[in-house]
Amino acid sequence: VRGTRGGFIRELIESKKYTPEEFAAVQNERKSRGQSANADDGKIVEQQGMTMREKLEHMTATYSDRLTFAKSNIHGWGLVAKVFHKAGSIVTQFKGETCRSTVADIRESRYEEDGVDCYLLKQDDDTVVDCTFQGNYARFTNHSCNPYMYSKIVKVDNENHIIFFARTDIKAGEELTYNYRFESEDGKVPCYCGAQNCRGYLC
């Protein structure tokens, strides 16, 4: 996304798979870190005990209270947390116009010819979400080789949604990032995420 040439995102990253024991250990560790890391004014994203539909509704209702965008040290504008988000909580949905993959390919070529930053993310084998001209703050999410968020396809009311979850505890004021794992058709695109494990390129 973010105006990279040939940067149409064709795959989402699969979440790490845990055994029940490993998952419980990770959750306990995250809870302990979350209690000590909260230096905010008491506003914390809490989603325990909610159904997925309720979580999505809560995400939408609190969107502008939790998220904003600002100039980024990585590239252009970036998505920024306004409050503390616990690891594992829903951060945002990648919203936009849903179109077929064939249409997305045509649009990407047109955006590139017109010099327009394109925001395209694959939802499933047949559909892509185009956030270029309509969508939410999620389109300002920059790439990082060590991101704060990971994605999952969540089905609610028989509709797929691309949801970004907090990969770790996120403090207010931190830029929210995601590993897009681009497929570039025009050569490697430099990465400026600044992470210690930065690969140097987006693909």
Question: What residues fall within each predicted segment?
Answer:
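Accessory low-complexity/Zn-finger-associated flanking regions
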Residues: 1-77, 189-190, 195-203
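Generic detection of intrinsically disordered/low-complexity segments and helix-coil linkers/edges
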Residues: 2, 12, 17, 57, ...
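Intrinsically disordered, low-complexity segments enriched in small/polar residues
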Residues: 6, 16, 21, 109, ...
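Alpha-helical interaction segments
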Residues: 8, 13, 67, 109, ...
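Compositionally biased, intrinsically disordered low-complexity regions enriched in proline and serine
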Residues: 19, 64, 112, 120, ...
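Catalytic cores of histone-lysine modification enzymes
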Residues: 30, 38-153
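C-terminal SET catalytic tail plus cysteine-rich post-SET Zn-binding segment of SAM-dependent SET-domain
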Residues: 145-203
